[in-house]
């Protein structure tokens, strides 16, 4: 009777125990070769079969998990690289021109969860001309970040004293089309302010229209032709426009990450709310204004995840440059 009990009950239980112990001892590193055989025709055999099936399923799960984890790590590393590329290319030391009394400028870029290709720039074209750039590259990750570097570099290199900005964007567009294997495009706005006369020459390539605040007035959207995006089609000709700025006037430019910021109810922040926020803070200097706009966006979206960068720039023309005719 003992041997019967041992064969029918104890031995199958020992086989199951030994199999479980082997899995633990080997840290489940060899699940593919795991095998357990109990032929009793009862619940022990059913349990052994279930054990065998479980190890096969677990082996497949671990394989898939390894692949998914590796892919997530790759994507994470790529996004880190893209973030570093993006942030390293943007001027971020303020005040940017501490010795210049003719103007004040401030800009910020808050990257989204998925790194995009927003960029801004500002630089002296020569002693009396200040250029500002606001742009948004389509796509995400490293390709968008690298295309951002190319676009930003080309715009700055081709913005030369006395050049028409329409010609600048026409040349930049053709060059970008040649180096566009990913099929990306850039919306961009560039303006050059003559610090002596106050003339502001600008060109727009499918970008958001700026807000202008005249001295003593309020921020209002400045209606200009959007133009065609950069890198979208070769041979496009761009036309520059001009406006006259007086001391005390301000320009606010931004990317669509602001107006398209969305809350948990799928409502957009929108142009109207942006204009209201700018009007409430009309007397603030650029470095004070931009944090107020960002704070209002944050209060609107609350905890909703944003998938587009939030980028903005404000330029205040404070005084005419003297000593140059």
Please annotate each region the language model reported.
Residues 1-5, 156:
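Hydrophobic alpha-helical membrane-associated segments
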Residues 8-26, 30-56, 62:
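HAMP signal relay modules and closely related sensory coiled-coil linkers
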Residues 267-282:
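Divalent-cation-assisted or electrostatically stabilized phosphate/pyrophosphate-binding catalytic cores
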Residues 163-168, 281-290:
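Short, charged, surface-exposed loops that flank catalytic or proteolytic processing sites
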Residues 64-252, 302-325:
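… and, occasionally, acidic/histidine-rich disordered N-termini of signaling adaptors
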Residues 212-216, 262-268:
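Cytochrome P450 core scaffold surrounding the K-helix E-X-X-R motif
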Residues 292-303:
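Low-complexity, intrinsically disordered Gly/Pro/Thr-rich segments
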């Amino acid at each position: 009777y003992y041997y019967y009990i041992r064969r029918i009950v104890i031995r199958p239980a020992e086989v199951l125990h030994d199999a479980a112990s082997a899995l633990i001892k080997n840290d489940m590193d060899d699940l593919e070769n795991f095998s357990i055989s109990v032929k009793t025709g009862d619940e022990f055999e059913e349990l052994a079969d279930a054990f065998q099936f479980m190890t096969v399923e677990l082996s497949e799960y671990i394989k898939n998990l390894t692949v998914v984890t590796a892919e997530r790590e790759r994507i994470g590393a790529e996004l880190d690289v893209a973030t570093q590329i993006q942030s390293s290319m943007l001027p971020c030391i303020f005040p940017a021109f501490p010795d210049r009394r003719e103007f004040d400028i401030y800009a910020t870029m808050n990257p989204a969860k998925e790194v995009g290709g927003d960029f801004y720039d500002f630089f002296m074209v020569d002693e009396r001309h200040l250029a500002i750039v606001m742009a948004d590259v389509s796509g995400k990750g490293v390709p968008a970040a690298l295309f951002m570097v190319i676009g930003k570099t080309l715009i700055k290199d081709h913005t030369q004293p006395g050049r028409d900005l329409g010609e600048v964007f026409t040349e930049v567009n053709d060059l970008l089309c040649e180096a566009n294997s990913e099929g990306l495009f850039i919306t961009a706005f560039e303006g050059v302010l003559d610090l002596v006369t106050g003339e502001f020459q600008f060109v727009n390539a499918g970008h958001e229209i700026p807000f202008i605040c005249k001295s003593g007035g309020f921020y209002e959207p400045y209606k200009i032709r959007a133009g065609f995006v950069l890198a979208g089609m070769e041979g496009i000709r761009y036309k520059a426009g001009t406006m006259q700025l007086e001391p005390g006037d301000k320009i606010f430019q931004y990317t669509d990450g602001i107006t398209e910021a969305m809350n948990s109810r799928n409502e957009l922040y929108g142009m109207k709310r942006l204009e209201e926020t700018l009007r409430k803070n009309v007397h603030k200097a650029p470095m004070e204004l931009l944090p107020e706009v960002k704070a209002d966006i944050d209060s609107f979206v609350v905890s909703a995840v944003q998938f587009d960068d939030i980028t903005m720039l404000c330029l205040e023309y404070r005084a005419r440059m003297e000593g140059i005719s």
